[in-house]
Regions:
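A short, N-terminal amphipathic alpha-helix
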Residues: 1-8
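Active-site-proximal beta-alpha core segment in soluble small-molecule metabolic enzymes
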Residues: 9-131
């Protein structure tokens, strides 16, 4: 990790995606080495919090987040990546019911293709992000 950090500009932050390996011992170890943890479920969120990761440095992404998962993430102060209009509505309701601050980022799928990358991220409804 030290070599990777040395090769990157200081403003670049390194996050561990728990979907790579959510084993608590691995997350405990990685939490000490990275700037944040990315989770995709309530169980991953629990493991990340139990590892001692700062809630401010945890992000929650993925389609189909359940109301209970959103409530738990908001209560903990996690950054939530909004991926649908339904999530916006749910988060607004949580905010109105609790008064809790809601930290969000919006995943947007632009309607263009990156030339020569082989990747097309938008151009129609997808389960990941808002077009």
């Amino acid at each position: 990790m030290a070599e990777l950090r040395a090769a990157l500009p200081a403003e670049i932050k390194i996050h561990y995606a728990m979907k790579a390996n959510p084993m608590p011992a691995v997350v405990d170890h990685m939490a000490k080495l990275v700037d944040g943890i990315d989770v995709a479920s309530a169980n991953e969120l629990k493991v990340a919090l139990d590892s001692g990761a700062n809630p401010h440095d945890i992000s929650f992404a993925g389609p189909g987040k359940r109301t209970e998962e959103l409530q738990r993430a908001v209560a903990a102060g996690i950054l939530i990546n909004i991926e649908s209009f339904r999530e916006i509505t749910e988060l607004r309701a949580i905010r109105q019911a609790t008064g809790w601050q809601v930290r969000v980022a919006v995943r947007v799928n632009p309607d263009f293709e990156l030339k020569s990358s082989g990747m097309k991220m938008g151009g129609g409804p997808k389960q990941f992000g808002i077009d």
